[in-house]
Amino acid sequence: MHKYDVVVVGGGHAGCEAAAAAARLGANTLLITHKISTIGEMSCNPAIGGVAKGVVVREVDALDGIMGRAIDQASIHSVILNSSRGAAVWGPRAQADRKLYKQAIQEIILNYNNLTVKEESVDDFLIESNNNGELCIKAVITSSGEHILTSKVVLTTGTFLRGVIHIGEQVTPSGRMGDKPAVELANTLKKYNFKLGRLRTGTPPRLDRGTINWSILQEQVGDNPPVPFSYLTEKINQPQVSCFITHTNENTHKIIRENLHRSASSYLDDIIAPRYCPSIEVKVNKFAEKSSHQIFLEPEGLDDDTVYPNGISNSLPIEVQREMIKSIKGLENAEILRPGYAVEYDYIDPRELFHTLETKKIKGLYFAGQINGTTGYEEAAGQGIIAGINAALSASEKKESFVLHRTDSYIGVMIDDLVIKGVIEPYRLFTSRAEYRLAIRSDNADRRLTQKGYDISLVSHERYSVLQNKLESIKQLEEKLGSLTITPEQLRSYGIKISYDGIRKTALDLLSYPNIDWNKLQEIWPELSSVTRWNGKMGHTKADNRAKNEICEAVEIEAKYKPYLIRQEADMKFLREEINTQIPINFNYSQVKGLSSEVIEKLQTIKPATIGIAKQIQGITPAAIVSILVYLRNRKTKVAASFA
């Protein structure tokens, strides 16, 4: 029998990040997937990133993950969403050439050190009890009956657990168009008493590029130059193409309304679909007052005639889909290459997980991605990398785990939401979910997380060197700006009015004002024109222009956010101290006086690792938190006294 430190099941976005992370940490890792040819498949939209989501991609990259580098090799239309607003809500997004993205992922995964890929499916586990009576993973059992020994398993099954596809009245067991579902594995999870629920999602029909009348559509041009996701990418090399915009109309809506009874939405209403990415049937039915809905026509590749009409996901019968498409401006003669469909699938209640994404029921078993009730490639990747890291650390018998918090990352926000609050609908990240979004931005993911990754040997020396060079250059530039001073009176000659208190202001001080930018500073201090060639004494391995832009941008953003970040840091410090108060894993809450039976039951079920986590559980009162804190402190005092 073969033996591996870590086995990852599923070759999607979560699985690839989990497998790569475990392998980077030195774990002998096996990635098991139904088809090697579908590793890195973009099952739905051909794009990576977006508001909040783009920050996650940067965070994964900062930890030496692979998604950012792969999309940079496949990017054919790049934009920074919300670029006219503050940096806290910037959303990097890139349209991908599907083939190039999958090719990039496969090239990385199939040549990764410490990583083996096997084409197979997993149906069951070999589980044993340890000396403490805990259930532990000992092996995975494949559909062919093979036992593969391992103590750590990461499940990243996507929409495959008892997946069923719906196109009108046509129902097909499938995890994705053309791929069989994972039925036995779902039964296995049920056997071990995991709480399973049912969710659904959907995808639009794919259109033939050559049958679309592009001349009457609104063109949407990407950013020039396109901005890479990865901190290691010098520039985007692929040719950039435009996307186009059209809209549904009253006739489109009439066709949909007349056929709502034939849509899967009509008989799957008890299975919840994504709230923030609704099907066109839901849009028309829920927002009846709207006369049109926007559709983005997104190319799926440079040499691919397939077009993705973002905004009309549906599960109507194919003949209705054809009629609907032809009612839309520019699509009157459009041909459908593949129909849209809905897919329903099993997910587990993520409250059954620790923040490491290890399950509470079975030691050594981790879940990541849509199996946890999330939606989106980026959310999957963020979970995958955390699960892979912790599986590898645990396999190496290192005591520490790797947990990101709400205060340091969007990944931390997402996982905290999942394991504490759970989900009743497909979970999607937004900036509004992050209380500390001013500090966890798309521009500073490397400065927030790369050191953390390097400290556990997850991050390469190359990436760490790039970060150190960047930090040194930022420091030098801030020192340069801090050495240049001017009085409020002198500023009047440049049309700048600030408080006339007689106190000299540095160039760095001025940069914090909303109406002062680099151009204004260069007007006051012409010698700062050299900042356009700023490269720092240590230099950079990336293209000078991007390095310069990142450094100047970092200094300006930090200057403008500084007053707010100082206040926020005080809040974050208090929160960190509170959330880091540890609660023993097998803590007996019934010993704490004053806790109701309801509170005890919730705490025993969720098993919060810290006071901060316990506070977020619905129904846990401040009085209960105080009682637990007092009990823990008294116990700590008694233990200390016994050793005195």
Curated annotation (Swiss-Prot):
<dbReference type="InterPro" id="IPR040131">
    <property type="entry name" value="MnmG_N"/>
</dbReference>
<dbReference type="InterPro" id="IPR020595">
    <property type="entry name" value="MnmG-rel_CS"/>
</dbReference>
<dbReference type="InterPro" id="IPR026904">
    <property type="entry name" value="MnmG_C"/>
</dbReference>
<dbReference type="Pfam" id="PF13932">
    <property type="entry name" value="SAM_GIDA_C"/>
</dbReference>
<feature type="binding site">
    <location>
        <begin position="10"/>
        <end position="15"/>
    </location>
    <ligand>
        <name>FAD</name>
    </ligand>
</feature>
<feature type="binding site">
    <location>
        <begin position="273"/>
        <end position="287"/>
    </location>
    <ligand>
        <name>NAD(+)</name>
    </ligand>
</feature>
<keyword id="KW-0285">Flavoprotein</keyword>
<dbReference type="Pfam" id="PF01134">
    <property type="entry name" value="GIDA"/>
</dbReference>
<dbReference type="InterPro" id="IPR049312">
    <property type="entry name" value="GIDA_C_N"/>
</dbReference>
<dbReference type="GO" id="GO:0005829">
    <property type="term" value="C:cytosol"/>
</dbReference>
<dbReference type="Pfam" id="PF21680">
    <property type="entry name" value="GIDA_C_1st"/>
</dbReference>
<keyword id="KW-0963">Cytoplasm</keyword>
<comment type="function">
    <text>NAD-binding protein involved in the addition of a carboxymethylaminomethyl (cmnm) group at the wobble position (U34) of certain tRNAs, forming tRNA-cmnm(5)s(2)U34.</text>
</comment>
<keyword id="KW-0520">NAD</keyword>
<dbReference type="GO" id="GO:0050660">
    <property type="term" value="F:flavin adenine dinucleotide binding"/>
</dbReference>
<keyword id="KW-0274">FAD</keyword>
<dbReference type="InterPro" id="IPR047001">
    <property type="entry name" value="MnmG_C_subdom"/>
</dbReference>
<protein>
    <recommendedName>
        <fullName>tRNA uridine 5-carboxymethylaminomethyl modification enzyme MnmG</fullName>
    </recommendedName>
</protein>
<comment type="similarity">
    <text>Belongs to the MnmG family.</text>
</comment>
<dbReference type="InterPro" id="IPR044920">
    <property type="entry name" value="MnmG_C_subdom_sf"/>
</dbReference>
<keyword id="KW-0819">tRNA processing</keyword>
<dbReference type="InterPro" id="IPR002218">
    <property type="entry name" value="MnmG-rel"/>
</dbReference>
<comment type="subunit">
    <text>Homodimer. Heterotetramer of two MnmE and two MnmG subunits.</text>
</comment>
<dbReference type="GO" id="GO:0002098">
    <property type="term" value="P:tRNA wobble uridine modification"/>
</dbReference>
<dbReference type="InterPro" id="IPR036188">
    <property type="entry name" value="FAD/NAD-bd_sf"/>
</dbReference>
<dbReference type="InterPro" id="IPR004416">
    <property type="entry name" value="MnmG"/>
</dbReference>
<dbReference type="GO" id="GO:0030488">
    <property type="term" value="P:tRNA methylation"/>
</dbReference>
